[in-house]
Amino acid sequence: MHNAAPITRRKSKRIYVGKVPVGDGAPIAVQSMTNTRTTDVEATVNQIRSLERVGVDIVRVSVPTMDAAEAFKLIKQQVNVPLVADIHFDYRIALKVAEYGVDCLRINPGNIGNEERIRSVVDCARYNNIPIRIGVNGGSLEKDLQEKYGEPTPEALLESAMRHVDILDRLNFDQFKVSVKASDVFLAVQSYRLLAARIDQPLHLGITEAGGARSGAVKSAIGLGLLLSEGIGDTLRISLAADPVEEVKVGFDILKSLRIRSRGINFIACPTCSRQEFDVIGTVNALEQRLEDIITPMDVSIIGCVVNGPGEALVSTIGVTGGHNKSGFYEDGVRQRERFDNEQMIDQLEAKIRAKASMMDENQRITVNLVDK
């Protein structure tokens, strides 16, 4: 029920990764990357399908060898989400996966080779209508830039990116996006700011090698939150040393928190104190697990007492405010006569949320049909 984010998106060109639009105001796409061995086709396909179930828009797959390229062909045939092939060192692998229907090629300027090899990749991409991501990383800058700057700096990452943007410009190829990732939050943020001021291509955001599930999510939320709040960014990936499914969840949570893109339930819950009239923490944890399948955007407030509960409920799709034995129930900001038994809170609230999601989905379907007519 909250208003849309007061953020003006940076203007950028539109490209397509498979059928997913990127840039020019398109919804910011959430990306992840497999961490299986690509040659293990079954494991990789299963992981991609698990990512699809939590709403991933694009999946990157590492293709380090020609054997992996052959496996990529089989993987591509068994999944629906667009796949990006991650290519390092051997440009010929990029040429091979292009034959197999890859949706985007990610190349690293620091190790893909000379301009002639890049030209070969670009010619192949153009022929097969495949976009490219120039992926600059603070940990793998070109040797001459390492010597020039001494260490990764925003200017070094920018120079690396622009060096290869200029090559693509000379080759009259504009179907590309760019990333300038670093593990240091401020280095990454400033690098993206400099790049955003120089080009109008779509930008892929990420804090590389951010860390484990908790620390990596925090770093990514800070870095990407700063950039997204400034309107910078067209796709994103949360790099975690954790299950890739968590990357997707955190990515959507960041977009949801900034009211840029909503998918599923935005839970608003108090941290609890001695005033709570029911088990808020247990209720929230249970509902988050039970309702993972809900993709309808809605705000659900679960507040343990009447201090802040009514106020939060007024701006929530569904709200509950703790009371003695029974708690108040709100729908679309309006208090209902019905009250929830505190001992049955989880089951009752789940039923109300599912019913509301179903009604909202049906209303959306009717609206779309009327517009189409």
Swiss-Prot record:
What molecular function does GO assign, one term?
A: iron ion binding
| Positions annotated to bind [4Fe-4S] cluster | C270, C273, C305, E312
Q: Tell me the NCBIfam families matching this sequence.
A: ispG_gcpE (TIGR00612), PRK00366.1 (NF001540)
Q: Which terms under GO biological process does the entry name? A: isopentenyl diphosphate biosynthetic process, methylerythritol 4-phosphate pathway; terpenoid biosynthetic process
UniProt keyword annotations, A-Z:
4Fe-4S, Iron, Iron-sulfur, Isoprene biosynthesis, Metal-binding, Oxidoreductase
Q: Which PANTHER family match?
A: 4-HYDROXY-3-METHYLBUT-2-EN-1-YL DIPHOSPHATE SYNTHASE (PTHR30454), 4-HYDROXY-3-METHYLBUT-2-EN-1-YL DIPHOSPHATE SYNTHASE (FERREDOXIN), CHLOROPLASTIC (PTHR30454:SF0)
Q: Which reaction does it catalyse?
A: (2E)-4-hydroxy-3-methylbut-2-enyl diphosphate + oxidized [flavodoxin] + H2O + 2 H(+) = 2-C-methyl-D-erythritol 2,4-cyclic diphosphate + reduced [flavodoxin]
Concerning its family, UniProt says: Belongs to the IspG family.
How are cofactors bound according to the entry's free-text note?
A: Binds 1 [4Fe-4S] cluster.
- Under which pathway is this protein filed? Isoprenoid biosynthesis; isopentenyl diphosphate biosynthesis via DXP pathway; isopentenyl diphosphate from 1-deoxy-D-xylulose 5-phosphate: step 5/6
> Which N-terminal stretch is annotated as signal sequence?
none
Protein name according to UniProt? 4-hydroxy-3-methylbut-2-en-1-yl diphosphate synthase (flavodoxin)
Q: What is its EC number?
A: 1.17.7.3
Q: What does this protein do?
A: Converts 2C-methyl-D-erythritol 2,4-cyclodiphosphate (ME-2,4cPP) into 1-hydroxy-2-methyl-2-(E)-butenyl 4-diphosphate.
Known cofactor(s): [4Fe-4S] cluster
Q: Which Pfam families match?
A: GcpE
Top-rank taxon: Bacteria
